[in-house]
Regions:
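Short, basic, glycine/proline-bearing loop/turn elements
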Residues: 77-83, 126-132, 225-227
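Short beta->alpha linker loops
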Residues: 32-33, 110-114, 135, 258, ...
């Protein structure tokens, strides 16, 4: 199987599994507890059907949308995800260049393996910095100031990782950042020699936003769950979020909102957007899927800030359903991470192109020529 054989999400996942050592593949692929929420994130879309219109003249389709004051050529963007160099040696460089090619937003994690300064010098398309609230206030201030100096357009505070989720696949495989060889993982790494060669020869693994402040994930092996549970400030509250919003002074979003009450409070503290997200099912198993919560959140605050539907998206039709419910855009991590592992920049570009092609085809079949044509009249819940 090669990149040219990848035509959808599942294909990219299969190729990623062939290329990555087991601990690293399962870090992407896994979720919390019994992974019920992880599965529901996608199956939720099956509970609603599309109602197409015909004879609408659909020769030209415009997929553009505007979020956080920036016009994107696509109604979806690449959500911030951590540790991308583990999945391909080009990591965020590959993803950023792919986002630039398609003029969509690129989300950069505080746990990125490439600095905001390098990303900013490399791409001029819209950029989001995703921020964790650490116990170390100096680290928090440094992250904000670096992202501001690098002219990032949006600051997104992740609010659903107050402690690490119970990711049992990681416990079984012994996944750590950086990777370490254990008896349980030795065979897996040995069977993926090209990954190992690239990892060892294509530059040092670093977390540039953290390395001057903490050792976790840089020169000390640690699990991501341990990082969340020990380094992040569990006393974080709405006053802290409001202060960060004011300190940033630009477009500010909360990533991980799942309730109407929290969406309303996000408006109150000055947020200009929220990501309706459960962290890809990686935190609280048994929680609702973003798509399940989307309508009531849009009804409550959709006219006051940008509502993004994040998670579980495998198809263009999933995006159409979320956009029809009122989301301003969609986003996700796995929707491009498998492609990154499968083929680097070329893989991410192929994945984006596939989603774009699906969206154009699906819009035409729906009788729509622009995103604003999509509405709830297009949907029927079962």
């Amino acid at each position: 199987m090669s990149l040219k054989d990848c035509h959808n999400y599942s294909d990219f996942r299969k190729l990623a599994k062939k290329k990555l050592p087991s601990p690293i593949f399962h870090y992407i692929d896994g979720a919390a507890d019994d992974e019920i929420t992880y599965a529901r994130n996608t199956s939720a879309f099956d509970d609603v059907d599309l109602v197409p219109n015909v004879l609408r003249g659909v020769e030209n389709v415009d997929l553009s949308t505007t979020i956080f004051g920036k016009k994107l050529d696509l109604p979806f963007y690449l959500a911030p995800t951590a540790l991308q160099r583990l999945f391909h040696y080009d990591g965020e460089r590959a993803v950023g260049k792919a986002a630039k090619k398609f003029n969509t937003m690129f989300g950069v994690s505080a746990l990125a393996t490439v600095s905001v300064e390098e990303i900013s010098s490399m791409i001029d398309t819209p950029k989001m910095f995703q921020f964790y609230f650490h116990k170390d206030r100096g680290l928090n201030d440094a992250c904000l100031e670096r992202a501001k100096a690098a002219k990032f357009d949006v600051m997104a505070l992740t609010v659903d990782t107050i402690t690490g989720g119970n990711r049992e696949r990681d416990l079984r495989t012994g996944f750590t950042s950086p990777p370490k060889l254990t008896l349980s993982s030795l065979f897996s790494f040995a069977t993926k020699p090209m990954w190992g060669i690239n990892y060892l020869t294509k530059g040092k693994f670093e977390l540039p936003h953290l390395q001057d402040h903490v050792k976790e994930g840089t020169d000390t092996n640690t699990s991501i769950g341990n990082y969340f549970s020990t380094m992040l400030d569990q006393s974080m509250n709405w006053k802290d979020a409001e202060k960060l919003c004011s300190q940033w002074g630009g477009h500010f979003a909360l990533k991980g909102i799942m309730s109407v009450d929290d969406a309303k409070r996000a408006v109150d503290i000055g947020c200009t957007g929220i990501m309706v997200s459960n962290h890809g099912g990686r935190q609280l198993d048994g929680s609702r899927a973003p798509f399940d919560q989307l309508a009531e959140i849009v009804d409550a605050v959709g006219d006051k800030l940008d509502v993004i539907c994040e998670g579980g998206i495998h198809r263009g039709t999933h995006m159409l359903k979320a956009l029809s419910l009122g989301a301003k855009a969609c986003s996700g991590g796995r929707l491009y991470l498998y492609a990154l592992a499968a083929g680097g920049q070329a893989g991410v570009e192929r994945a984006i192109e596939k989603y774009k092609t699906e969206l154009i085809r699906d819009m035409k079949l729906m009788g729509c020529t622009k995103i604003s044509d999509l509405n709830r009249n297009n949907l029927r819940f079962r």
